[in-house]
Regions:
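Low-complexity, Pro/Ser/Thr- and charge-rich linker/hinge segments at domain boundaries
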Residues: 142-145, 266-279
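Positively charged n-region of N-terminal signal peptides that target proteins for export
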Residues: 1-4, 18-19
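Acidic, serine/threonine- and proline-rich intrinsically disordered appendage/tail regions
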Residues: 277-301
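Hydrophobic residues positioned within well-ordered beta-strands of beta-sheet architectures
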Residues: 43, 116, 160, 171, ...
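Primarily secretory-pathway and cell-envelope proteins
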Residues: 18-78, 126-190, 287
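C-terminal motif of bacterial Sec signal peptides marking the signal peptidase cleavage site
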Residues: 13-16
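Sec-dependent N-terminal signal peptides
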Residues: 6-9
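Tryptophan-paired
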Residues: 65-130, 182-270, 295-301
Length: 301
């Protein structure tokens, strides 16, 4: 009887060990598996943002996670987390800034190798495309991203701090001459502007030619050198260029001034500023590459 009990004990041990070693990686291809039933470990990710760029940014700022995720002085509104194993999305989370656990998403990760992709943004009207693994915004604004790799075993530390990198770029239009009292808006039309992000690669997607406008408050009428309009986009790590038409329009929609910008360069975590006289004839714009991402502005779009 003792021998039988010992044998049964060994068999139970073998079964338990086999279950412990079962991971998503060794499931047969095409097999339909409920990943939530695999051995797993609970992870809590504390999300923050690192705004330092080795080339352009001199000072680092961080998200005040988990309560308040902020980029350029404004709160992020959306946080997405996508968990991939064997190049397949097995689970995802979408948080908004009003969620109780905002900035500290939790996931149970099955044992094995994971790529966990994070996206934090305050862009307007986001649309998620699961098949294309991308997010496209109606109006992109400050946005951060990270591809975070983790190997999950039974002894893994389940508390992880994840630092995201800025993938947004910015066009700044600075008007140096006096603002007329009937100015209604500043409009820009880039020939190419990226509105989306491939959350697996971090590449900019969804290039569009679309007009963007910023409404000018009456408090700027009669002022000189104060009018600054910001226009955000998504950018990859490589520099790219586009041509831009700029118009200043009156409150009656009349054109008060305009300019053409050729070959404007853009790159993630960088502001490209054009400054000059928009209302004076023959004024033109000067270009500068700026690390002053967070300066006060008249308006943004």
């Amino acid at each position: 009887m003792k021998k039988i009990i010992m044998l049964m004990g060994c068999l139970l041990c073998l079964v338990a060990c086999e279950k412990e070693n079962l991971t998503y990686e060794n499931i047969d291809e095409g097999e339909d598996v409920d990943v939530s039933k695999l051995p797993s470990k609970k992870f809590t990710f504390t999300v923050k943002g690192e705004f330092e760029s080795a080339t352009f940014m001199s000072n680092a700022t961080t998200f005040r996670a988990p309560v308040y995720l902020s980029g350029d002085g404004n709160a992020m509104t959306d946080l997405w987390v996508f968990d991939y194993m064997n190049d397949r999305c097995v689970q995802s989370i979408h948080q908004v800034s009003t969620d109780e656990s905002w900035g500290k998403p939790q996931m149970s990760l099955a044992y094995g190798t994971h790529h966990v992709y994070f996206v934090a943004s305050r862009g307007d009207s986001p649309t998620l495309d699961d098949e294309g693994h991308m997010i496209v915004w109606g109006i992109p604004k400050d946005t951060f991203w990270k591809d975070y790799s983790v190997e999950v075993v039974s002894t893994s530390n389940g508390n992880r701090a994840v630092t995201l990198d800025r993938v947004a770029t910015k066009l700044k239009i600075s008007v140096n001459d006096e603002v007329p009292s009937n100015l209604g808006e500043i409009a820009v039309t880039p020939e190419k502007w990226y509105y989306g992000l491939d959350y697996k690669t971090g590449d900019a997607v969804s290039a569009q030619k679309k007009e963007r406008t910023v409404t000018v408050p009456e408090s700027y009428y009669g002022t000189t050198g104060r009018l600054v309009a910001n226009f955000f986009g998504i950018s990859g790590s490589d520099e790219w260029t586009t041509n831009i038409a700029v118009e200043a329009r009156g409150t009656d929609a009349s054109v008060l001034g305009k300019a053409s910008i050729t070959g404007a360069p853009f790159k993630r975590n960088r502001a490209t500023e054009y400054s000059g006289n928009l209302f004076a004839s023959g004024g033109g714009f000067d270009v500068s590459i700026s690390d002053d991402w967070d300066n006060p502005v008249t308006g943004e779009c």
